[in-house]
């Protein structure tokens, strides 16, 4: 399944995302598309994989842009319904907004993640998305 997913992708899957594994349920993979000017990473999630709730903090600017590139996934801001991400879907995540993103339960998923430059930027990793919350998504 991973090999079939890799063939459908424009960007490499990359390496296991071990540095951030503690903030994910399931396995994810990371490929740095660009690290100059703006950080751009291809993040691949196995089916059911999602990251914890988190916040991209900044006093000015900051945040993140996600662009779906393969498979099917989800993005959710706290207090709002989840949004389906398909190839070509663009998600603008403002700084200081609690959210999570990851694969659908039945699909491999990949998105490009663009780190938006800002002042005093940092990431705050929070609690996992519960199975109860996640299992409601279809």
Predicted stretch roles:
Residues 2-41, 52, 122-138:
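A short, N-terminal "cap"/entry segment at the start of jelly-roll beta-barrel domains
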Residues 36-38, 46-50, 72, 119-120:
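Short, charged/polar surface micro-motifs in flexible loops or helix N-caps
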Residues 44-46, 57-75, 114-116:
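Short, conserved beta-strand element in jelly-roll/cupin
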Residues 53-54, 75-76, 93, 98-104:
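Short beta-strand His + acidic residue motifs that chelate non-heme Fe in jelly-roll/DSBH
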Residues 79-96:
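Short acidic-glycine-tyrosine-enriched beta hairpin
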Residues 106-125:
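A short hydrophobic beta-strand segment most commonly corresponding to one strand
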